[in-house]
Amino acid sequence: MKLFTRLLEWGAVGAMALATTALAQKEQWLDYHVSREGRGYHYLTLTTNPPPNIKLPKCNSQPYFAQWTTPMDPAGRWLCLDRTRKSGLYDRVYFDTTGNGRLDDKTPVGTTQRDQYSASFEPVRVVFKGEDGPITYHLIFRFMQYGEGEANLMSSSGGYYAGKVDIGGKKRPVELIDENVNGTFNDRAADMSDCDGVAIDGDKFGERRLGKMLEVDGQFYLVEVARDGAFIKLQKAENVTLGQVRVPEAISEFVAFGENGHFTRKPAKGEFTLPVGEYRIQSWKIDRKDARGAAWVLSAYGFNDSAQFEVAVGKPASLEIGEPMRAALQIEKPMAGPDMRVPTNQLGFNLRFEGRYGESLQIMKGDQRPPGPRLTLTSLDGTYRYTNTFEFG
């Protein structure tokens, strides 16, 4: 593991004025933990074609193969899915744990739970070569196949780092999570889905994705994480330049992610501040009570690329989010047959509520979903009438 000693480089010139304190940060070491509850997820591409130059095990049936890619090993790691019987669900996996290019010398890993359509596997121990010795990591796989449909394999991180970290003079439990499941814990990117995560105990905003900074109890900290997750460095960020953001006054919570980090805001009369820089809207909420005092929440997620915005000094960013919302009705004709190419005599109706940036909207009454909208179909001459209720799914 290579210890970080260089000063953090900053992207936009003049975006923020920070004291040169990164070199003063000290490593705060964390412990590695293994869990059967996977963190993050990433789908692997399955193929029935054997990988070249990989020695394979003797299988009981036609196997599936997949390659897991990781910055920790440029060659990646291959795996083989097999059955304990000649037919049925795939329920054991051979994985190149050591990176020696062989699967025939590996012991297969079995399942922790399974049903008719899926199987979850025991954590697979992976070993990387590090500068200071071997580095251990764990992967969790879940195989899914519904009937004769397409087979899918999902990978999750089965290991994480945790420990007590000094944040502003107070020791707080911290966890580092490999959210993009590539074997490293320090990934930062413009797209939040490509970033790793950090969770701070007692933090009301929960897990955040990694950026240049973390905000804890209203204070900004420069953050640096070891590639293998073994330590974290935090340094109070001084003289952070902020810019104004405006949203409709009905917005009760707003979440954005950008080069600077992952931030949650509770707007006051539709206004709040963020460190200057580029961001993307991640979510928003509207809280409201009806005439009977029942609490309702309208929340948004899954924004398109138009949800990007810039925070600058002296130029407030105005975001048109919130109400009104749009109802989009999609009608499809399901297909059938072995190759799913035979038209049926049925129609499928899908109702989706969305916002201005293509975001999906969800409505909750307390902790429950309200009854779904009703759909009524009537023929032009009125001789046919059909009524049904949409279900969440």
Language model segments and positions:
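Calcium-binding acidic motifs and repeat modules
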Residues: 24-260, 266-380, 386-393
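Hydrophobic h-region of N-terminal signal peptides that target proteins for export
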Residues: 13-23
